[in-house]
Amino acid sequence: MMAALREACRSLWIAIGYFTRIPVPASVGFSQDGLNRAARFFPLVGWLVGAAGALAYWLASRTVPAPGVAVAASMAATLLLTGAFHEDGLADCADGFGGGYTAEDRLRIMRDSRIGAFGAIAVCMALLLKWQLLMAMAAQHAAAAMAAMVAAHAASRGMAVSYLLTHDYARMEGKAKPVAQPMGRRDAAWAALFGGLPLLGFGMACAAIAVAVLLAARWALGRYFTRRLGGITGDCLGLAQQVFELLVLWVLLAWTSS
């Protein structure tokens, strides 16, 4: 039991170290197998990132009576904490899908670390939409907005990592090479549980609607990735996380506004 608990803690630290800028203990170490086992905890990283964003929002809202400024501070905190890890994937995918005519062209463009017009526009639009959704929710109920931050970060990561259960990897290089390994059903079940729990704070009906929307988007994006690339890449997972996060915020805003 204690050995299993220690291994779970180590896996959680590995997930935190991979997806955030938080320093991890040197004793944790790193291995591909360890990162694969850590996949179940990726949504818990979303809990951490969302909580950091909620805390930044709360602190900012105590200093200035402007929800828009507090939301911007919240978003800045999450970007700093993650190093814009998923936004980078969104930008790479936008450049690749927007500028490539074949799967090889798209993958080549996505490997280029430089950002192009499609990538810049995609990231700007995603950040603007996220800011607007959160600001609209915060203007109605600040507590709901903070809860939505945690729910959106957790659920989006839980749904994005599920591609490792069902889709093949299109290339064997890039940031996500270590994590883009087949995911076991047990790990997927844990990831789904960790990703879905925060949604229940908005009620069972709202959570069910959010999950249904995410599943539909997951199916559509999965087909698109397969048709355009022949599989998924780490950048695709970043794009998916960003899309899923926006969809969760959209559903939660619609629910709390009705």
Curated annotation (Swiss-Prot):
Membrane protein topology class: Multi-pass membrane protein
Cofactor(s) annotated in UniProt: Mg(2+)
Enzyme Commission identifier(s): 2.7.8.26
InterPro entries: CobS
GO CC annotation: plasma membrane
Keywords, ordered alphabetically: Cell inner membrane, Cell membrane, Cobalamin biosynthesis, Magnesium, Membrane, Transferase, Transmembrane, Transmembrane helix
Functional note: Joins adenosylcobinamide-GDP and alpha-ribazole to generate adenosylcobalamin (Ado-cobalamin). Also synthesizes adenosylcobalamin 5'-phosphate from adenosylcobinamide-GDP and alpha-ribazole 5'-phosphate.
Descriptive protein name: Adenosylcobinamide-GDP ribazoletransferase
Lineage of source species: Bacteria, Pseudomonadati, Pseudomonadota, Betaproteobacteria, Burkholderiales
